[in-house]
């Protein structure tokens, strides 16, 4: 006996699953994509002449289209399965004279953090060995102070740390506040891979967060680092109370530097009790993802690094960021003064989703330029017409 289930439902609710609608044409898709995004997806090399309006066009693209475009750009310039594992150590904690509203290490706020002297060189190198043994390929060191003026002994110790980490075959990055041209050269000669100095936010919003160091002073330090031949690492913090326009402004400023930074850290504010921003809520995930995707598109060859606040994201949210172009994380025991995802946790996540750790210096030693990678993709497409084009939207 046959049974007809459709008779029990009103005719209006019966769906014709066999109906095939006409597919939208490529032109109809393109008409909904901002011109700036179309140009970015087709690009074969980074450009440093983005206008703020163009960055805004990209940032305001509907999120599903934006992340899809970011994934296409990511595959054009990077291995989409490779994630750089970095470990950050505080080599000098607390006692900083600056008034950064988000920072637990400022001496102006009562956060319960005890100031320390600089860690001994041997202790730092041992931490680097542990990080390497656990899979990290970049070791970063941070010191809580305004600048390096009058710190000759400290600079000497930092240079020993840099040389020691490089001898292990690891990349090494430091963040020491403002430095001058001579100090940058000394660090370069010691073997420094990268120098971190975040812009934090847009020029317009910056004075509401920090008053003891100007935006131009930050840009000057980046200039010294770049002129010394050291890779620039510079990004921002999300959730400071900024508007979308400030996230757009940050990315525009970084993209307008003489050359794009080697890495762009995306930090989500971790509210610290006792600081002026201690009662802030974490930024919504859609805005964080939108920032990651925009950074990937506007800074196509740059490493986009998930930094502070990643521990608050679910595994699925982290993977969404990776698929939208993030390709580095901080991992290990701590990230300066805040909690951090651990090595075992991250390796297990990579295994579940098909990612793997980027090798040390992989970005530098890979002989293929972005254009050569594009040519390779095109060649594979000719051999296999079914393969999707990297830039297709």
UniProtKB/Swiss-Prot annotation:
It catalyses: (4R,5S)-dethiobiotin + (sulfur carrier)-SH + 2 reduced [2Fe-2S]-[ferredoxin] + 2 S-adenosyl-L-methionine = (sulfur carrier)-H + biotin + 2 5'-deoxyadenosine + 2 L-methionine + 2 oxidized [2Fe-2S]-[ferredoxin]. Binds 1 [4Fe-4S] cluster. The cluster is coordinated with 3 cysteines and an exchangeable S-adenosyl-L-methionine. Induction: Expression is increased when transferring biotin auxotrophic mutant mycelia from biotin-supplemented medium to biotin-deficient medium. It comes from the Eukaryota. SUPFAM superfamilies: Radical SAM enzymes. [4Fe-4S] cluster binds at residues 96, 100, 103. It holds the Pfam family Radical_SAM. HAMAP family: BioB. This is Biotin synthase, mitochondrial. It comes from Emericella nidulans (strain FGSC A4 / ATCC 38163 / CBS 112.46 / NRRL 194 / M139).
């Amino acid at each position: 006996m046959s049974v007809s289930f459709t008779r029990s439902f009103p005719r209006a609710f019966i769906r014709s699953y066999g109906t095939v609608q006409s597919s939208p044409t490529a032109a109809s898709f393109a008409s909904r994509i901002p011109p700036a995004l179309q140009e970015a997806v087709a690009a074969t090399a980074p450009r440093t002449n983005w206008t703020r309006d163009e960055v805004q066009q990209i940032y305001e693209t509907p999120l599903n289209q934006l992340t899809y475009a970011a994934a296409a750009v990511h595959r054009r310039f990077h291995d989409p399965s490779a994630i750089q594992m970095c470990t950050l150590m505080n080599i000098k904690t607390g006692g900083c004279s600056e008034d950064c509203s988000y920072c637990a290490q400022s001496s102006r706020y009562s956060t319960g953090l005890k100031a320390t002297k600089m860690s001994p060189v041997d202790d730092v190198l041992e931490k680097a060995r542990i990080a390497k043994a656990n899979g990290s390929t970049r070791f970063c060191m941070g010191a809580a102070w305004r600048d390096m003026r009058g710190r000759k002994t400290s600079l000497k110790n930092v240079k020993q740390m840099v040389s020691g980490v490089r001898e292990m075959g690891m990349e090494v990055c430091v963040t020491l506040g403002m430095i001058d041209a001579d100090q940058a050269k000394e660090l370069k000669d010691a073997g420094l891979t990268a120098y971190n100095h975040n812009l934090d936010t847009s020029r317009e919003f910056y004075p509401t967060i920090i008053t003891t160091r100007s935006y131009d002073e930050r840009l000057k330090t980046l200039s010294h680092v770049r002129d010394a031949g050291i890779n620039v690492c510079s990004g921002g913090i999300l959730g400071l109370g900024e508007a979308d326009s400030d996230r757009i402004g940050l990315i525009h400023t970084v993209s307008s530097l003489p050359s794009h930074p080697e890495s762009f850290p995306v930090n989500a504010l971790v509210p610290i009790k006792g600081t002026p921003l201690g009662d802030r809520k974490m930024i919504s995930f859609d805005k964080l993802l939108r920032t990651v995707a925009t950074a990937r598109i506007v800074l196509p060859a740059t490493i986009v690094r998930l930094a502070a606040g990643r521990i608050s994201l679910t595994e699925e949210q982290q993977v969404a960021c990776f698929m939208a172009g993030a390709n580095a994380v901080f991992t290990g025991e701590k990230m300066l003064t805040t909690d951090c995802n651990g090595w075992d946790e991250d390796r297990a996540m990579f295994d579940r989703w098909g990612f793997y750790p980027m090798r040390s210096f992989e970005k530098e030693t890979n002989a293929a330029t972005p254009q050569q990678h594009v040519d390779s993709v095109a060649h594979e497409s000719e051999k296999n017409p079914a393969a999707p084009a990297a830039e297709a939207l």
